Amino acid sequence: MPIGVPKVPFRLPGEEDAVWIDVYNRLYRERLLFLGQQVDDEIANQLIGIMMYLNGEDESKDMYLYINSPGGAVLAGISVYDAMQFVVPDVHTICMGLAASMGSFILTGGEITKRIALPHARVMIHQPASSYYDGQAGECIMEAEEVLKLRDCITKVYVQRTGKPLWVISEDMERDVFMSAKEAKLYGIVDLVAIENNSTIKN
């Protein structure tokens, strides 16, 4: 049975009594954002709205975007990436679980030197896919042209953000390329691999 979104107590400034709010709203107040699903227009708009609000609230405090996503809509992912570059505060990106397709694209968009993968995280890159499987010839041609433009855009961003040559990124995007956290660091998608907290490990 689904339990819904957990709620936690939060005391507003100047108030004596705490109110119960969902855990994500509480974390947003600490500038912690989460992408824990497939990227679509709805989640993209939510993340962009939160980033714009936090940017206006305080431009001096960094934001932290935790990513566990299989990817999703290309334009929605690009819009999140662009918003990350637009806001004044640095956006740390932290990969936990999987950052695939547009998830990895958003991951690499974090502030350089502030992109992190947890030790057992996985990253995957590939080229954008077409949404037309059955359509008129003209529609398919137009779609193919648009996909090529998007692929070129994504490739250039990966080149800029990873430091890899254009030919390497272009070749790797021809197929699904999975990486461990350490491999993603060597590739340039992340800058650091988090260290396990051994104090929490019990014998």
Swiss-Prot record:
Where is it mainly found?
plastid
Q: Name one GO cellular component term.
A: chloroplast stroma
Q: Which UniProt keywords apply?
A: Chloroplast, Hydrolase, Plastid, Protease, Serine protease
Task: Give the protein name, as stated in the record.
Answer: ATP-dependent Clp protease proteolytic subunit
What does the UniProt entry say about where the protein is found? Plastid, Chloroplast stroma
Note the PROSITE patterns from the entry: CLP_PROTEASE_HIS (PS00382), CLP_PROTEASE_SER (PS00381)
Q: Which Pfam families match?
A: CLP_protease
Q: Which residues form the active site?
A: S101, H126
Quote the SUPFAM superfamilies the UniProt record gives. Answer: ClpP/crotonase
An example GO BP is: proteolysis
Q: What's the source species for this entry?
A: Marchantia polymorpha (Common liverwort)
What does the UniProt record say this protein does?
Cleaves peptides in various proteins in a process that requires ATP hydrolysis. Has a chymotrypsin-like activity. Plays a major role in the degradation of misfolded proteins.
